[in-house]
């Protein structure tokens, strides 16, 4: 059914975000920062409604003094509603990702470093994009001129906690649509009482009479393919709703129509290939895009991705231009117009209407891109790409057997997730081993010389090492692994992985160098040194200490204390005038 959508978004007057007193609120906020805890989870909450004269309209933004640019407001308005052709009646949940525009966002800016240093790379805060989690309701309503009630509640965050925020919306949105503004204000105040998301901690998050219990993943977690065990309930009343994950989707449900091509899709993601996912609705498109981008874990997905994208997006021209090669982006769309617009893209995945029966849906077929010409294109993976690795038939048999035996979908998802995790690890482990061999030996790190350089990554040397230490040691899949690595070297994911590993190794080298200095006899070193050399040492030690205290260097607390003691000792040996310069009152 087609429900018309108006010409475009506008800022609607009124609403909670517009009527709240800004002067007193800002003064209090500056003094007490009452939204600091809220902003550790969310940037803001938006309500988008359909106005007969204005089209999609931003009814309110809360907290009211959170600043969105006009371009961001317009993007949120369009992305918060399904395309008119999809005709989503009832309640629909989906997500989107949009680029931030510059400028200060709020009075209570969050420092990302503490969280990002401990979080898995794939779950770090987005530095330049907003993630929008949408609950859209469209129902018949005779009291409205058009005959339909159409409204979206949107949680805007920089955290990729799709499972948590979808669960949160399923509690908040139905209540909000009944009670409107006062309910939303109460919810935001409750979130402002939550503890910050600290990686490795299990948190109890009270909301609307319910307690949601979640564990925030940590970088040091052992990668598991099964859900974590339920934590102690701590005699909480009411008993908490335990989320087994803040971010993991039901992979089996997402990949059901494309299970026979999971291997090929994994390779396309690994290589950062441009891919369009054309789905019948934004919930299907956004979940499949997020599932695709998650299948490389523990690798961080380094390309752009848009779980739901529309022709009204401010970046539409930039991402669909034919004057240059398609960008490294995964686009989730629902408008068939994109088939014509993106004919030049090398890979298009067309998904049909989801089947809710227990049987496995008809699998999409591999088709040549040349057949992608009409708006009524049939479901299929349109690509000329040939997979480097052979298909894992044993996995497909196990999943098919699970369907026949009506195995729970969460168990099916765990099987699929473990397969993808082991596949990615088998690919990455040889790279990790080779990279580790480029690290200088600890015996070559001396206190009074600059630390040695990390050896350069030589692709030919690495490829030669695969004969004895390749993925065949941990993976039964056969195929052209060498060819896959060669293509991987040209991808954004190799660049992202290498930069991250090189940065970590450089920090480790610097930390080892600091430890070597702290274990040396500094009095003996100072005996024949000029004042200039001693002052230079103080300045360098201070710089290292600041970096270490800011968690940019992996050093122990005892090393930090010893470094500070060394600085004090060295300064104490200098003339009073220099001491006054180095330690001003």
Curated annotation (Swiss-Prot):
InterPro entries: cDENN_dom (IPR001194), DENND6 (IPR024224), Tripartite_DENN (IPR037516). Residues 246-373 form the cDENN domain. It comes from the Eukaryota. Transmembrane segments: none annotated. Residues 375-499 form the dDENN domain. Keywords: Cytoplasm, Endosome, Guanine-nucleotide releasing factor. GO terms for molecular function: guanyl-nucleotide exchange factor activity. Residues 1-10 have a biased composition (Low complexity). Residues 1-25 are annotated as: Disordered. PANTHER family: LD41638P, PROTEIN DENND6B. This is Protein DENND6B. It comes from Mus musculus. The gene is Dennd6b.
